[in-house]
């Protein structure tokens, strides 16, 4: 189910505060986050986030096409090793 429109998007307040501080100081540093459920807002465009996938941090550079999506969509948690070759059953 999607989130109700009357509630608005969820953005972690700590993450929002960090981006606001970086925008004010005009610095470009990597922002570490564990908040995979946070929605990407237009203020995040141009910043690099290190999104935790449960094991390590995956760097994600935010572009305009990513606005409205969530951080978890860009850091996969599972690795696909491939199916067994034919005859290897």
UniProtKB/Swiss-Prot annotation:
Transmembrane segments: none annotated. InterPro entries: Ribosomal_uS19, Ribosomal_uS19_bac-type, Ribosomal_uS19_CS, Ribosomal_uS19_SF. Keywords: Ribonucleoprotein, Ribosomal protein, RNA-binding, rRNA-binding. One of its GO terms (biological process) is ribosomal small subunit assembly. GO terms for molecular function: rRNA binding; structural constituent of ribosome. It holds the Pfam family Ribosomal_S19. It comes from the Bacteria. PROSITE patterns: RIBOSOMAL_S19 (PS00323). GO terms for cellular component: cytoplasm; small ribosomal subunit. Belongs to the universal ribosomal protein uS19 family. Protein S19 forms a complex with S13 that binds strongly to the 16S ribosomal RNA. This is Small ribosomal subunit protein uS19. The gene is rpsS.
């Amino acid at each position: 189910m999607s989130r109700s429109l009357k509630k608005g998007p969820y953005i972690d307040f700590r993450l929002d505060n960090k981006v606001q501080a970086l925008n004010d100081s005009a610095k470009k540093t990597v922002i570490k986050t564990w908040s995979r459920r946070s929605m990407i807002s237009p203020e995040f465009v141009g910043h690099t986030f290190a999104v935790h996938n449960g094991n390590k941090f995956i760097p994600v550079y935010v572009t305009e096409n990513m606005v409205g999506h969530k951080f978890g969509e860009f850091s996969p948690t599972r690795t696909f090793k491939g199916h067994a070759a034919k005859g290897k059953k």
